[in-house]
Amino acid sequence: MLSVLGMTYGDEEKLETLKYRLLTGSEKDLGSWGHEYIRHLALEIGQEYQNRLNAEKEVQDLIDLSLSLVPYFLSHNAEADAVDLLSELEIIDEITQFLDENTYPRVCLYMVSMVNLLTYPEDQQFLRTAHEIYVRYNELTKAIVLAIRLNDTELIKNDLNATSDKSLKRQMAFLIARQQIWLEPQAEDEEDQAFMECLTNTSVPKHFKSLGKELNILDPVMPEDIYKTHLESSRGAGLTNVDSARHNLASAFVNSFANAGFGNDKMMLVEGDKGPWVWKTKDDGMLSTTASLGMLLHRDVEVGLDKIDKYTYATEDQIKAGALLAIGLLNSGVRIYSDPALALLSDTDNLDAKNVPMRVASIMGLGLAYAGSNKEELLEVLLPIVEDVSLDMQLSAMAAVSLGLIFVGSSNHQVSEAIATTLMDEERQKQLKDKWTRFMALGLALLYFGRQEEVDVILDILKAVDHPMAKPTSVLASVCAWAGTGTVLKLQELLHICNDIIEENDEKKGDELVQSYAVLGLSLIAMGEEVGQDMILRQFGHLMHYGASNIRKAVPLAMGLITPSNPQMKVYDTLSRYSHDNDNDVAINAIFAMGLCGAGTKNARLAQLLRQLASYYHRDQNTLFMVRIAQGLLHMGKGTMTLNPFHTDRQVLSRVSAAGLLTVLVSMIDAKQFILGEHHYLLYFLITAMYPRFLVTLDEDLQPLTVNVRVGQAVDVVGQAGRPKSITGWQTQSTPVLLAHGERAELEDEKYIPLSSTLEGLVILRKVSIPWSPELRRNAADPRNRTLTLRNK
């Protein structure tokens, strides 16, 4: 009784409700005092726990008491309170013993949505606990999504092998392939041809083309269709002094982005009199133009190798180099067991060729073809190039980036040691002022992508390096390690870096890069979480007002990185203002960011803004080139692709996609030295992030199945009572359909159960003869459900 009175009377600091409850000793009649009392008690337990931790006192009695409150919360639809209480006491793994069939979905949903707001290692603990619960209740597709988020290969393998249901395994293989994880399958799975197709991503081109057929967009588009020159003001038409080779190169890029993955166009894959577009460009332009074949035929390896083959015998070295890069682009994101890319690109004639472009193209091609694969054989090929100090910095740096992409997020110690040793080497230190050094740093940073505190080892090593490049490298490494986590403390650290005023001295260049990377880091870390994104966008406004030129240059890029393929009015209107900035570098980066924001969306407002910019900058070659690139990005895949690294209902961050985006943005910090200079082929790193934004439904034999789905704006239903609708403002469409950013689909047809928890990408449907209900969905993975269906038939 005193405990209950303590709730209404007395000093809150004294925690009397808890004090008298602990003196009672009995925990039987807790619920009889009502919900308000239990919540008050939970609040005081949290406060007392902190007090005792600070005073280093025993806390076992508090833990026992809180565990007796959990069943009450769960039985009264207060799952959030139960999770919060156990989280406060750092014993979240205890929740598994209190759950049942009815309570676990809501508890897991709340736990998973909390992860973005937690710090390391608590976020990992939450994901592992939720994973364990899903496995216990046979929700394997939900479990494997969490295993993918944890980047734990052993967990992923265990989930995949936890069932003998072939269709379910194939669905999980689709989820693994979407994250570009290369798993070694078991012997019996290897014999299942269909399963291997799912795991290696080789079925994507087929379904992508069937989507194109459905939407009636198989006809290739020409750059002129995108530029719509007749809509640009005629004021500059007669006055342009654009170098035609440069203009043709821009058209080659636009053509490759717009027709990406469709395997047909009117410029490169043509026979007869017109001849391919390559001959209309010159020097380095030939390299990028030939490489665009890989983008056009993306993932369609058998056909692609055939088409690219003739270019490998060309007499011009630039065209040969382009063909090698095209092979890398073609194989990006698919896995072929015969390893054609490795055989062709690691051939000594190409890797040790006399001219630099061929070597660079081979190295970059290997990085793109095997991104995320952790393939050990590539260490023997690329590590010597990183370690050889006599080589040109460009080659070693590109090899470092390729290794960073191949072993992204694996913290592979062989690669990190090799790059760190190279950075410390006395011979190399003389060359570290080279513009390519930033890619050496990036290669090291990518190894620790998403590894959080594991990066501290490398940061300590970098403190020992006495060179201006050491600081930018450590900033890059730490932002990659915390990418997508939304960690507030890291964001504050980066804002402090941007606050520093750089003094004029020898180290100025390094310090300028530190600030530029810090700005990119702000959006890379805040990416995964919406509140953080809004806060950072506001900070970018301040940085543009008060920052030095090196910071102002990076802000538009960071704005593009925070919302790729998600054109928000507030973002692209701001970028549109920056695109007329007095500082030409800022304007160029803002234009590229506009392309990034609208990539693959064909947003009409953005298209109009870019057309206006094309006529405004008709005399400025560099800026006009960038406007064309942005127009190409906007029409990527004829409006069917996305560059956003988040997938599976925006839960999972694809490391490979984010790494590719970051590589392009790092080169854009000094656009005039790289992309606007001779190294425009660096734009092709975007291919790692390109993926069709479709929903294709398949039957259990993996044949396309047309069903009706509702597509609408996703609604957050965490912690809401009952079974609220998870989409709003929906329209009914028949599959295959396109999903814009922030949209979600629900099945309308009750005859089928989706085997995946989220309707996105490739989804297998299982037919049931009794009407669908949420309980049935839960048992979809259960083999007993299939016998029930057969019996009903």
What do these predicted regions represent?
Residues M358:
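Active-site nucleophile and cofactor-binding loops and adjacent substrate-binding regions
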Residues M1-D317, L330-K354, G372-K793:
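Long internal repeat-built scaffold domains in very large eukaryotic proteins
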Residues L366:
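Substrate/cofactor-recognition hotspot
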